């Protein structure tokens, strides 16, 4: 009679080859597997991660916080799954969502080493960006990449992101302050949400 009812949004997008959905508590082991398998591959592109990133127990508390962000609409953390949702092949995070007169957020993403070069991130981000623009009514999505990360720059350009600037010592990546190219995608036919 008195059951728990979650108000975490249920977002599950499908593409030709993927399921792109918000991560939840039951994904702890999948996320741990993804980060453990790709730890060395992702290291040059990400902030320093502690060991808990590679263990389900480390993801339990993190996912509780992520679910709160989902409820508040302040961030949306997507897992990129194979069609059977057995394995996470990548992640796409829309964070620091601001409404009001800005309606903007930041995009971060990564894909597992064995899945690179197949167009899967383009496929996933096309669906996730469409969701953020049409359902979350985001006008501006900002994404930044290190100048030597040609793959990321090419992906963002293909998605329609435009270069807006260059920031020195912008983010602490792999223990070093790194320069980044600043890009953004705006929604030309933006409409406010209800």
UniProtKB/Swiss-Prot annotation:
Q: Name one GO molecular function term.
A: protein-N-terminal-alanine acetyltransferase activity
* One matching Pfam family: Acetyltransf_3
Reaction(s) catalysed (UniProt annotation): N-terminal L-alanyl-[ribosomal protein uS5] + acetyl-CoA = N-terminal N(alpha)-acetyl-L-alanyl-[ribosomal protein uS5] + CoA + H(+)
Instruction: Output one GO BP term.
Output: maturation of SSU-rRNA
Q: What EC number is given for this enzyme?
A: 2.3.1.267
Q: Where does this protein reside within or beyond the cell? A: Cytoplasm
From the record, give the transmembrane residue ranges: none
The consequence of residue 54 to F is: Loss of acetyltransferase activity
N-acetyltransferase domain residues are 18-188
Q: What happens when the gene is disrupted?
A: Mutation of the gene impairs the acetylation of the N-terminal alanine of ribosomal protein uS5. Mutant is thermosensitive.
For whether the record's keyword set contains Nucleus, the answer is: no
What's the superkingdom here? Bacteria
> In the UniProt record, which is one GO cellular component term?
cytoplasm
**InterPro entries associated with the record:** Acyl_CoA_acyltransferase (IPR016181), GNAT_dom (IPR000182), N-acetyltransferase (IPR051531)
Q: Which UniProt keywords apply?
A: Acyltransferase, Cytoplasm, Transferase
Name the predominant localization: cytoplasm
Note the SUPFAM superfamilies from the entry.
Answer: Acyl-CoA N-acyltransferases (Nat)
Its job: Acetylates the N-terminal alanine of ribosomal protein uS5. Also plays a role in maturation of the 30S ribosomal subunit. Plays a role in the temperature regulation of pap pilin transcription.
Recorded family membership: Belongs to the acetyltransferase family. RimJ subfamily.
The entry's other comment says: Overexpression suppresses the cold-sensitive phenotype associated with the ribosomal protein uS5 G28D mutation (rpsE).
Subunit and interaction comment: Associates with pre-30S subunits.
Q: What is this protein called?
A: [Ribosomal protein uS5]-alanine N-acetyltransferase
Which organism is this entry from?
Escherichia coli (strain K12)
User: Mind giving the lineage of the organism this protein is from?
Assistant: Bacteria, Pseudomonadati, Pseudomonadota, Gammaproteobacteria, Enterobacterales
Encoding gene, per UniProt annotation: rimJ
